[in-house]
């Protein structure tokens, strides 16, 4: 029986580090990239007698997330100890939430192949992050433990098994990431581990009512790896079933170098963690007034912003989706459009440059919009140079690349690099006459109906003028000279 006769069933558990200045239960910094164990104290080191104190900002960010995702905010929630042993967990337990999480229900809506899909949520709960094992830190191959991350606040967002393909899982995660970034609760950086995703994957024969045995997949720090891991795991489980072998419930690790999953440990059930209420923390009471205040402060969310871009600015669903995928990029786009001009034509121009050339440059450098030397005003100035015929499209790309690298003003770059177009009809006409005289055969073919040769002539004229001829003037003169 081929894999097409099976249905893959996926649920995701997304761990999002919250953008607080300090950890969830102590005052240590959450800043990424410090020397190992620089941001630690008796609380996050798990020393005897050290007591946790809840960071209020964590509760507010959890409520903010829950409201944006349509969850029920529980007026009373409780922290619990999740007991397990691992070197990066100094207390021997993780403070999390179990029976009474802060948020329940909710959903995430995403678009795939032009259709909207919705995945329901089970819950959102608060918890502390663990530390990080660092291997081969010495010549003898010894491993170390960096506890800077221990105690960094997380929300875990748990979906129901509503996803039915690797592509759906990727689009769900993209939509959720965009929401978290728009809320300002998470930076969306999967490479640094501030947004992590585990996938629960099972397969069942199409038409069956009972779900198959699930395996949890870890170590996926990109959308590409999430897709690869789910697709491999689904194939692996189908092959086991077809061979008459059982699928064992377990936790598996994705190996990005080999593009496959491998067994990590047997999958634990809740009772294996011996959850019990955290005795050192009181219940979390969330008052209705706080919920309503946070509800009133919610920003425009990505789907609403994308719909506004399409409705008010005439952008395509594709362009709007690309812009709202990153809240910082969409805010930059709004500022650039305000600097350049209003209307659908202006919006399309700005969107093309933001999602095209600027996105390419940003991907090469890894810079966020806040660090771009191309400010919204500088992009607007570049586009005005194009509108005025001072530079063409290729010249504008050169200008933006230089501005992105140096922060120079666009008009100064045009002058320094000699990028200004020639619009003088006399100069262009001389080049046109020279090209037509050098290619009489092609000119006759054009006049005989081979109209596609116009591009050839334009290219030859631009070559003659070293790329500086105004394309509109070049085209007009060629058509006139060729008898159009």
From Swiss-Prot:
Single GO BP term: translation
Keywords of the record: ATP-binding, Ligase, Nucleotide-binding, Protein biosynthesis
GO MF annotation: an example: glutaminyl-tRNA synthase (glutamine-hydrolyzing) activity
Reactions this protein catalyses: L-glutamyl-tRNA(Gln) + L-glutamine + ATP + H2O = L-glutaminyl-tRNA(Gln) + L-glutamate + ADP + phosphate + H(+); L-aspartyl-tRNA(Asn) + L-glutamine + ATP + H2O = L-asparaginyl-tRNA(Asn) + L-glutamate + ADP + phosphate + 2 H(+)
Stretches of the chain forming a coiled coil according to its record: none
EC number in record: 6.3.5.-
Similarity remark: Belongs to the GatB/GatE family. GatB subfamily.
Task performed by this protein: Allows the formation of correctly charged Asn-tRNA(Asn) or Gln-tRNA(Gln) through the transamidation of misacylated Asp-tRNA(Asn) or Glu-tRNA(Gln) in organisms which lack either or both of asparaginyl-tRNA or glutaminyl-tRNA synthetases. The reaction takes place in the presence of glutamine and ATP through an activated phospho-Asp-tRNA(Asn) or phospho-Glu-tRNA(Gln).
PANTHER family reported for this sequence: GLUTAMYL-TRNA GLN AMIDOTRANSFERASE SUBUNIT B MITOCHONDRIAL AND PROKARYOTIC PET112-RELATED, GLUTAMYL-TRNA(GLN) AMIDOTRANSFERASE SUBUNIT B, MITOCHONDRIAL
Name assigned to this protein: Aspartyl/glutamyl-tRNA(Asn/Gln) amidotransferase subunit B
Organism lineage string: Bacteria, Pseudomonadati, Myxococcota, Myxococcia, Myxococcales
Encoding gene (name): gatB
């Amino acid at each position: 029986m081929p894999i097409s006769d099976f249905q893959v069933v996926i649920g995701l558990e997304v761990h999002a580090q919250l953008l607080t200045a300090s950890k969830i239960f102590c005052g240590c910094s959450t800043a990424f990239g410090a020397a190992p164990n620089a941001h630690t104290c008796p609380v996050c080191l798990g020393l005897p007698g050290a007591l946790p104190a809840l960071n209020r900002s964590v509760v507010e960010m959890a409520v903010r997330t829950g409201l944006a995702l349509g969850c029920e905010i529980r007026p009373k929630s409780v922290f619990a100890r999740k007991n397990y042993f691992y070197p990066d967990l100094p207390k021997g337990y993780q403070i999390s939430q179990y029976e009474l999480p802060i948020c329940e229900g909710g959903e995430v809506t995403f678009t795939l192949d032009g259709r909207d899909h919705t995945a329901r949520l089970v819950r959102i709960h608060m918890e502390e992050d663990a530390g990080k094992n660092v291997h081969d830190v010495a010549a003898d191959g010894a491993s170390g433990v960096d506890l800077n991350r221990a105690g960094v606040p997380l929300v875990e967002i748990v979906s129901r098994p509503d996803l039915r393909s690797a592509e759906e899982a990727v689009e769900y995660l993209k939509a959720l990431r965009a929401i978290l970034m728009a809320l300002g609760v998470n930076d969306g950086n999967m490479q640094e581990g501030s947004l992590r995703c585990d996938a629960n994957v099972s397969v069942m024969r199409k038409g069956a009512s009972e779900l198959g045995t699930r395996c949890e997949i870890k170590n996926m720090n990109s959308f590409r790896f999430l897709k690869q891991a789910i697709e491999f795991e689904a194939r692996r489980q189908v092959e086991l079933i077809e061979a008459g072998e059982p699928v064992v419930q377990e936790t598996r690790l994705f190996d990005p170098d080999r593009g496959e999953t491998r067994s990590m440990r047997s999958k634990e059930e809740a009772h294996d963690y011996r959850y019990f209420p955290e005795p050192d923390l009181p219940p979390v009471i969330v008052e209705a007034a706080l919920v309503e205040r946070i509800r009133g402060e919610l920003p425009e969310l990505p789907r609403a912003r994308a719909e506004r871009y399409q409705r008010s600015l005439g952008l395509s669903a594709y362009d709007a989706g690309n812009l709202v995928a990153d809240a910082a990029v969409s805010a930059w786009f709004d500022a650039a459009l305000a600097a350049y001009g209003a209307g659908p034509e202006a919006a399309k121009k700005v969107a093309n440059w933001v999602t095209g050339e600027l996105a390419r440059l940003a991907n090469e450098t890894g810079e966020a919009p806040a660090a771009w030397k191309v400010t919204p005003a500088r992009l607007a100035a570049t586009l005005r140079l194009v509108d005025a015929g001072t530079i063409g499209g290729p010249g504008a790309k050169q200008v933006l690349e230089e501005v992105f690298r140096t922060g120079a003003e666009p008009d100064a770059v045009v002058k320094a690099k000699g990028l200004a177009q020639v619009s003088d009809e006399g100069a262009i006409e001389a080049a046109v006459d020279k090209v037509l005289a050098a290619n009489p055969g092609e000119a006759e073919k054009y006049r005989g109906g081979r109209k596609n040769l116009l591009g050839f002539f334009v290219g030859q004229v631009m070559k003659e003028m070293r790329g500086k001829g105004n394309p509109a003037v070049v085209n007009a003169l060629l058509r006139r000279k060729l008898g159009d």
